[in-house]
């Protein structure tokens, strides 16, 4: 018998292990004064544009760090709009704050706006200024303060030679300071300093910027200039500026400090070129739709499909929402990805965890070139702005016909008994030197039904014979791709030969079947097993 307890059992942690609940993070509050709020968020201009457009349902899109000001912005904007509407006896307008716009926040979130049937979107903060596909947009960049004295001293410290040629640009949130900085530089003797202004042209020499100059110059003229960017630019802009100017300097904010990111950017560009070489040997390419709001994204997808098909590669179009390595790793048959998005979000910055390389449409064009043609002169573009969507259809058809003619010549049988695919020149991975046999899967032969060109046989009732009804089930020869409806499908081939689990029931294929036998019967005090008696 167990001994009796002399005291109550300890059912709690010791006194010195007091449960400590971490204090909740304090909820941030808006620190702007009423006047500063109206100025920063341009309440008056926004209200005027809304009234001029006649929009009744307005969606406000904030970046995450500005959401703390959202309630006050809604209140101030409603008050400004309703003051004039009441005087004119107009119905009240409704304002909505769009939620879940963190991913690709530089683009106007038309999907979130459609959830509230918004007529217009007011986009706050920095933006890529990509044209929208459906809804009109009002852009409010907001503004930040800049210490002019420290800024000029940093530039003078870096550029002691006052004859240097400088282009001054800034992030949209600091754009209002550019003209003042250039004016102060010219007072210091930097007469070759020029400013920039905002323009909605992602395909410009500086995306969405125009260089202000008394004379008209081509892009080659500006390659002799050094460019200074006020505030930290995104990686896509960093790469673009690095490849188009003599030198690149970044004035970090809010404490102005001039940095030279040349070494870091050069390393990033080399890594981009390595990914291009990886895609050059890929046979199956995934077209990753990263936006549904940018204009021309559908035509861009069609253009990419055509160019991938011309290279005898297979493409699959996939939409997964917010990107992460786990989502893309589910598509094991995809050997590389190309992102369809704006010029900023088209570049996946933190891509170390991705199983397959992810590149931009411009990089894909370089990857699809033949080894004889592939020359990268250092130019770089981030989005779909350089896809050549306005190419004439006849040019594309001629190019396609040329590719077919080239393919026919390439596949001619050669002496020595080598036929068909075996007569094609070998392709190698430029990184590893290994022979690649699957870089152009759409060239591989597909089993075709020989009876399709023969006359139809019929039985006495005039119906097709069973042989013709089942002629689609034909065993593939070695080296042939699986096909769906007569079209080669690397995805189906991977499902057949590459995936270890292909769906419910497929894991029973290798199990040997057994006869049904009589099992144990009876109750707990005695069982009977077949004819062996009671146990």
Curated annotation (Swiss-Prot):
Cofactor: how and how many bound: Binds 1 [4Fe-4S] cluster per subunit. The cluster facilitates the reduction of the catalytic iron-sulfur cluster in the DPH1 subunit.
InterPro entries: DHP2, DPH1/DPH2, DPH1/DPH2_1, DPH1/DPH2_3
Family indicated by similarity: Belongs to the DPH1/DPH2 family. DPH2 subfamily.
Organism: Gibberella zeae (strain ATCC MYA-4620 / CBS 123657 / FGSC 9075 / NRRL 31084 / PH-1) (Wheat head blight fungus)
Protein name (database record): 2-(3-amino-3-carboxypropyl)histidine synthase subunit 2
Cellular location(s): Cytoplasm
Comp. bias (Polar residues): 449-471
Cofactor(s) demanded: [4Fe-4S] cluster
Top-rank taxon: Eukaryota
Function in brief: Required for the first step of diphthamide biosynthesis, a post-translational modification of histidine which occurs in elongation factor 2. DPH1 and DPH2 transfer a 3-amino-3-carboxypropyl (ACP) group from S-adenosyl-L-methionine (SAM) to a histidine residue, the reaction is assisted by a reduction system comprising DPH3 and a NADH-dependent reductase, predominantly CBR1. Facilitates the reduction of the catalytic iron-sulfur cluster found in the DPH1 subunit.
Pathway info: Protein modification; peptidyl-diphthamide biosynthesis
Annotated keywords: Cytoplasm, Iron, Iron-sulfur, Metal-binding
Biological process terms in GO annotation: protein histidyl modification to diphthamide
GO molecular function, one term: 4 iron, 4 sulfur cluster binding
Segments of this protein annotated with the region Disordered: 390-471, 512-535
Subunit field text: Component of the 2-(3-amino-3-carboxypropyl)histidine synthase complex composed of DPH1, DPH2, DPH3 and a NADH-dependent reductase, predominantly CBR1.
Composition skew (Acidic residues), residue ranges: 404-424
Chain sites annotated for binding [4Fe-4S] cluster: 107, 128, 342
Composition-biased stretches (Basic and acidic residues): 390-401
A cellular component term, taken from the record's GO annotations: 2-(3-amino-3-carboxypropyl)histidine synthase complex
């Amino acid at each position: 018998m167990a001994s009796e307890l002399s005291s109550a059992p300890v059912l709690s942690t010791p006194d010195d292990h007091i449960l400590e609940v971490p204090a909740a993070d304090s909820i941030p509050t808006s620190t702007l004064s009423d006047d500063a709020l109206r100025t920063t968020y341009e309440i008056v201009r926004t209200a005027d544009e809304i009234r001029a457009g006649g929009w009744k349902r307005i969606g406000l899109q904030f970046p995450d760090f500005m959401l703390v000001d959202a309630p006050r912005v809604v209140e101030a904007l409603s008050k400004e709009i309703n003051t004039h509407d009441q005087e004119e006896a107009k119905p009240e307008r409704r304002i909505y704050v769009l939620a879940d716009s963190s991913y690709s926040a530089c683009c106007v979130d038309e999907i979130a706006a459609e959830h509230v049937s918004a007529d217009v979107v007011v986009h706050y903060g920095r933006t890529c200024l990509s044209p929208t596909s459906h809804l009109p947009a009002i852009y409010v960049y907001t503004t930040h303060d800049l210490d002019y004295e420290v800024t000029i001293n940093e530039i003078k410290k870096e550029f002691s030679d006052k004859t240097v040629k400088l282009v001054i640009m800034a992030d949209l949130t600091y754009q209002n300071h550019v003209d003042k900085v250039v004016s102060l530089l010219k007072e210091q003797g930097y007469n070759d300093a020029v400013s920039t202004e905002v323009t909605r042209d992602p395909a410009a020499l500086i995306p969405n910027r125009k260089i202000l100059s008394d004379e008209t110059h081509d892009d080659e003229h500006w390659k002799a200039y050094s460019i200074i960017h006020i505030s930290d630019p995104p990686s896509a802009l960093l790469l673009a500026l690095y490849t188009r100017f003599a030198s690149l300097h970044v004035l970090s904010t809010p404490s102005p400090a001039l940095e030279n990111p040349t070494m870091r950017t050069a390393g990033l560009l080399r890594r981009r070129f390595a990914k291009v070489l990886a895609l050059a040997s890929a046979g199956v390419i995934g077209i990753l739709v990263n936006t549904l709001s940018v204009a021309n994204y559908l035509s861009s997808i069609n253009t990419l499909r055509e160019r991938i098909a011309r290279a005898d590669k297979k493409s699959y179009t996939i939409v997964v929402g917010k990107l992460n390595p786990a989502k893309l790793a589910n598509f094991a048959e995809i050997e590389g990805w190309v992102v369809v998005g704006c010029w900023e979000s088209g570049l996946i910055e933190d891509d170390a965890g991705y199983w397959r390389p992810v590149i931009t449409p411009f990089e894909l064009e370089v990857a699809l070139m033949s080894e004889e043609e592939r020359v990268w002169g250092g130019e770089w573009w981030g989005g779909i702005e350089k896809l050549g969507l306005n190419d004439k259809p006849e040019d594309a058809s001629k190019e396609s016909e040329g590719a077919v003619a080239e393919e026919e010549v390439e596949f001619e049988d050669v002496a020595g008994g080598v036929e068909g695919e075996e007569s094609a020149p070998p392709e190698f991975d430029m990184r590893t030197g290994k022979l690649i046999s699957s870089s152009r899967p759409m060239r591989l032969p597909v089993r075709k039904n020989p009876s399709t060109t023969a006359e139809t046989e019929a039985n006495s009732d005039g119906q097709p014979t069973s042989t013709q009804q089942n002629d689609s089930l034909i065993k593939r020869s070695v080296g042939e791709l699986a096909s769906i409806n007569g079209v080669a499908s690397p995805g189906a081939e991977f499902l057949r030969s590459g995936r270890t689990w292909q769906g419910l029931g497929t894991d029973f294929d290798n199990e040997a079947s057994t006869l049904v036998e009589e099992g144990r019967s009876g109750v707990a005090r005695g069982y009977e097993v077949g004819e062996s008696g009671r146990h």
